[in-house]
């Protein structure tokens, strides 16, 4: 109880008990730099679900549309500190929404100058604008015909204040801005950044068009990694450097040891053959001495076997990446499924982050190395 009271004092230093039994608290809750008066009356058992919340008229007005949520939080919060933290977060949201609702509209010159800038840029570049013209999306096409979007969130003091902008790039996009800047200046910087990344997107598009990419299924333009099928239950994961896209990428293989090890040996032996003048795909073919499975002949289902434990292919966005090393078995599993399975076996043993056990299918020895690798 003392720990809870200390935590409550830290979270809400202006809310204090008004009696010895601590059934009545009164004071202030702070949010967005403002303090709001409130009083909480608890029953003798201190259960929040039977408590009463008395608010000042300012606080009651701000929370007027959130009455049901406040009631739900009181019903389900285990103690007063938990409820106060939830109430504080709710108050922050309510105040933010209120500020946006009652924010003063931009002056007329905001719209006139913005319309003029879009006209200079070309209305064909505008793909979206909300009713207030506070959010707009502009498109651009690179030399290879790919379309790219930039989303701009304009503030009331535009152009004195820089807009927020969002792009789907594999590297940070930092546009310079002065009070004299305009949509034309930020769009020019957007175009320059697109051209600087053309070689990277050429490399990734060739991989997407000519190989079976297992992950990601629908890669955004910002994605630098690809997991490419090499055959049944064997794949290579590559991480391409957007600034040096034709250099040797980070590579690691996924699959049974008896299939993966020969590929690793070839990569080490032939690494000197890597030629930055060639594409990543061509270099991988030369270095690994393989032909990637052709999209024209094979279907993706030829490489996408379900997990042998959960019987699904996709699990929380991941696909099976662990394979039984027994060449007669080769059953794939999700890492987390295999981990939970092995952890439940009395015969399994663990050494650091490696678990040793038996394959659920063939009962041959199987090893699982747990990692924090993102899929």
UniProtKB/Swiss-Prot annotation:
Pfam family membership, one:
FANCL_d1
Species this chain originates from: Homo sapiens (Human)
Protein's name according to its UniProt entry: E3 ubiquitin-protein ligase FANCL
Which reaction equations make up its catalytic activity?
S-ubiquitinyl-[E2 ubiquitin-conjugating enzyme]-L-cysteine + [acceptor protein]-L-lysine = [E2 ubiquitin-conjugating enzyme]-L-cysteine + N(6)-ubiquitinyl-[acceptor protein]-L-lysine
Q: What is its EC number?
A: 2.3.2.27
Q: Return the broad EC class.
A: transferase
**Domain notes, please?**
The UBC-RWD region (URD) region mediates interaction with FANCI and FANCD2.
A Gene Ontology cellular-component term: intracellular membrane-bounded organelle
Q: Which UniProt keywords apply?
A: Acetylation, Cytoplasm, DNA damage, DNA repair, Fanconi anemia, Metal-binding, Nucleus, Transferase, Ubl conjugation, Ubl conjugation pathway, Zinc, Zinc-finger
Q: What is its main location?
A: cytoplasm
According to the record, mutating residue 359 to A results in: Abolishes ubiquitin ligase activity
Per the UniProt record, the lineage of the source organism begins with: Eukaryota, Metazoa, Chordata, Craniata, Vertebrata
Q: Which GO terms describe its biological process?
A: DNA damage response; DNA repair; gamete generation; interstrand cross-link repair; protein monoubiquitination; regulation of cell population proliferation
Please state the gene responsible for encoding this protein: FANCL
User: In UniProt terms, what is the effect of altering residue 248 to A?
Assistant: Impairs interaction with FANCI and FANCD2
Q: Effect of altering residue 311 to A?
A: Loss of interaction with UBE2T
């Amino acid at each position: 109880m003392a720990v809870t009271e200390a935590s409550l004092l830290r979270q809400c230093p202006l809310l204090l008990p008004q009696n010895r039994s601590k059934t009545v608290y009164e004071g202030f809750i702070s949010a967005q730099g403002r303090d709001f008066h409130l009083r909480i009356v608890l029953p003798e058992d201190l259960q929040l679900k039977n408590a009463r919340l008395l608010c000042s008229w300012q606080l009651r007005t701000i929370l007027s549309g959130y009455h049901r949520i406040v009631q739900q939080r009181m019903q389900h919060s285990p103690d007063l500190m938990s409820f106060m933290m939830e109430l504080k977060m709710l108050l922050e949201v309510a105040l933010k929404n209120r500020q946006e609702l009652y924010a003063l509209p931009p002056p007329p010159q905001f719209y006139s100058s913005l319309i003029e800038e879009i006209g200079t840029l070309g209305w064909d570049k505008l793909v979206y604008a909300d009713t207030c013209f506070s959010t707009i999306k502009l498109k651009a096409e690179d030399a290879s015909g790919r379309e790219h979007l930039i989303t701009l969130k304009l503030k009331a003091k535009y152009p004195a204040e820089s807009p927020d902008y969002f792009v789907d790039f594999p590297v940070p996009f930092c546009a310079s801005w002065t009070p004299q800047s305009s949509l034309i200046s930020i769009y020019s910087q957007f175009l320059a950044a697109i051209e600087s990344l053309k070689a990277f997107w050429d490399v990734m598009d060739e991989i997407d068009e000519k190989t079976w990419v297992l992950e990601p299924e629908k890669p955004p333009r910002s994605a630098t990694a690809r997991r490419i099928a090499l055959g049944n239950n064997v794949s290579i994961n590559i991480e391409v450097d957007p600034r040096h896209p034709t250099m040797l990428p980070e590579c690691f293989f996924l699959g049974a040891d008896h299939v993966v090890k020969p590929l690793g040996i070839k990569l080490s032996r032939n690494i000197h053959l890597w030629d930055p003048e060639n594409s990543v795909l061509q270099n991988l073919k030369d270095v690994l001495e393989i032909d990637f499975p052709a999209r024209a002949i094979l279907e993706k289902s030829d490489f996408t076997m379900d997990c042998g434990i959960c019987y699904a292919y996709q699990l929380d966005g991941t696909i099976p990446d662990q394979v039984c090393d027994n060449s007669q078995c080769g059953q794939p599993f999700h890492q987390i499924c295999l981990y939970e399975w092995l952890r439940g076996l009395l015969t399994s043993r663990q050494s650091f982050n490696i678990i040793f056990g038996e394959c659920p299918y063939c009962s041959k020895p199987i090893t699982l190395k747990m990692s924090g690798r993102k899929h």
